[in-house]
Amino acid sequence: MIHIEDADPDHADAKVLIAALSQRLAAITGSSGQASFEADDVRGPGAAFLLARDEQGRAIGCGALRPLQPGVAEIKRMYAAVSGQGIGSAVLAALEARAKSLGYEEIRLETRRVNTTAVGFYGRAGYRECPPYGRYIGRPEAICFAKPVVFASV
C-alpha cells in the first residue's frame, strides 16, 4: 500500500528523493533538471509537495505542483524510486486531485524527449503533447504535456 502525504521539499526524505531524481535525469538526459525547480515554488497557496511512503514508512516517491499561470498548474520533480510498482501513478493521481481541489483547470509538465519512459507514462495517464511554454520555448529537447483537470483522476 502506498501512502501519500504533504511534505516540505527541504524535508530530509524529500531531499534524498530529489537528489536521486536529479541523478537519474542526468544519466538519461544529460541534465539534472535542478535548474527548473525552486523549492519555494511548491510552498504556499496553489502549490504542493507530496511524498509517497510504503507500508514501512520509507519514502519511495515524490512530486510537486506549482502555479504556472491563472488556472494552470505545473507538475515538477515527479519521481518513483522503483518502476512498475504503481508509485508514480499514485503520486500523479494525488497531484491531479490536489490540482482539482485548488481550482486549476489544466495541468502542464515538461520532460525531455529522450526520457521515453516518462513520455510513455504521461501519455498513458492521458496527457497530450502541447506547445512549449515558458523556459521550454525554443528548446527542441523538451516535450511539454497538458491535461485538463476535469479529466484528471480523483
Cite the ranges covered by each PLM segment.
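Acetyl-CoA-dependent GNAT
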Residues: 2-76, 81-82, 92-93, 98, ...
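C-terminal "cap" of GNAT-fold acetyltransferases
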Residues: 2-3, 9-10, 105-108, 112-154
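Glycine-rich phosphate-binding loop
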Residues: 86
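Alpha-helical macromolecular-interaction surfaces
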Residues: 90, 94, 116-117
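A periodicity- and composition-biased signal for non-globular, repetitive helical segments
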Residues: 82-83, 118
